[in-house]
Amino acid sequence: MSKKRKRAAPKGQNKKKIENSGYSGGGANLSSNILKSWFPVKLSSKSDIDRNLQILRNRASDEAINTPIGAAAVNTSTLNAVGTGLTLFPRLKHRILGISPDDAREWSRRVRQEFDMWASSKDCDVYRRNNFYDLQYIAYMAYLTDGDSFALFRRKMPTSWMPYSLRLQVLEANRVSNPLLSGNTAPYGISSVEMRNTDNGNRIVSGVEVDDDGAIAAYWVSNKVPFDRIDVDGIVEWQRVEAFGPRTGMPNILQICHDVRADQYRGVPYLAPVIETLKQVSRYTTAELASAIVKTFFSLFFTQSATSMDVGDVLGNPYGSYEGESVDESHAPIVDVGEYALGAGTLNALPKGVDVKAVDASNAQSTFKPFLDELIKQVGAALNIPSEVLTKAFTSSYSASRAALLQAWDEFKARRVWFARDFCQPVYEAWLTEAVATGRIEAPGFFDDPLIRNAWCNAEWFGPAMSILDPTKDVTGSHLRVLYGLSTREREAAEMTGSDYEDNLAQIAYEREKMQELGVTESDKTISSASAAAGDGQDEQSDEKGDETDEKMLENPQRGRFL
């Protein structure tokens, strides 16, 4: 019986066809020439952030100090988010407290006056150098440069001129770190990023002590910057500062920081995403500056024909004679360079066979400006600051310039809210607690119920107003928001001018009374006509005419205030 021969399978029939699916054909492609050698690794926030913090801070600090664009980014954000300081506006919840709106306004007015007495005094600073509003500027700039900053609550005896004991001490990020060579700590793992407190078993991550749940328990603060080569007085010592008081639950130290990842305990410098680009911009700018300086030089070369004598015989040896070389004094150079000069109407006679040629240092048109503008746009996009605002160059139309301001203002307002939550509001609550405890401010039920305490402590913080390109349009928009119930006069006054609406009303009433007393009348007709003309112009203005108005607006900066 013949055996049946097995039929061979066609070649390649058993091979399964591989097809790209999902991201394997895009960002996860392993065969692309661009991506096949690119294998970045994302690890924990400790590995990605804390391990690189020291070099990030050093480089970001250098960029913020020594590069124009880096300094512009930090200074612009600080100036617009904080400026001269955020101002307190108490907003106690009178319905929860069971008091009338009039009583609530009177209490708020009293608290603002009392708080400003403490905040405007340099006694609120433990160093007695800055008031509370100046400390805001310092803390915010340190937060941008280093990624986070800290403020310690300190106490000093009240005096006749300062009835409060609360003091603030602002610290930079490098003052909070792991306590190296300390008796009650031990290294943990292979990196000094994380250590362990042997007293309670808590972990210490870059100076932040956390419990088993990951909650912050304490901060380790050094008495000076570790490894400082100038401040060598005494040894570096660390002190453990509990994050919150065990009896009151109030913070003992504030960390100004905005987290971007889960399980993050330290902040990332503001300039971290653009450090490399800023460095390249700085190098490119320096090279172009050196090239521009070289172009201003005017160089001359003496040349000789083939039949003339040696060039050394013509000009002499500019470096003098060599050691041991005999010099024939009678054989002087034919051309004394010191006798020839350039000037208007100057005529110089050169020996036979000697010629002068000028070197033109100019080259082709440089692409410096367009290339630099593109790099600055990338930097601005990463920092959420349009390039027009970053460079203070408003060369486009009014609409484009205002759009850039509005985009930047969204960034500034967000950072202002973060900063007020981390710094201003906790400081106000600590101050108000002392004011109520000492009897300078009356707040019934403040220490009895957390809900009541929160109702008394509720507040808003307003800072510098957004720059205005066309005051007429902005005031008209503000008027319409109030008219349709989208905002209040008090909020508009605070956001547009940083002023208090009730103070404005009192001053206006006084001015009108004084004008009537002196027989001066207001030109209401002129004001109404101007407002009507502005409204008609906005309704009938075409896009083409709008662009012409925009150009005139930018040419006449007196009509608006730029950043």
Residue ranges of predicted features:
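Extended, charged amphipathic alpha-helical segments
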Residues: 246-401, 531
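Extended, Lys/Arg-enriched charged tracts that mediate electrostatic binding to polyanionic substrates
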Residues: 137-231
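Extended, helix-rich architectural segments
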Residues: 1-146, 153-166
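Short, surface-exposed, low-complexity cationic segments
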Residues: 223-245
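Surface-exposed loop-to-helix/strand elements on domain peripheries
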Residues: 105, 122, 126-128, 343-469
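Short coil/turn segments at secondary-structure boundaries
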Residues: 130, 153-155, 292-297, 390-394, ...
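Acidic/polar, glycine-anchored loop/turn motif associated with catalytic or activation segments
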Residues: 214, 379, 492
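Activation/maturation switch segments at domain boundaries
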Residues: 2-5, 354-358, 364-365, 405, ...
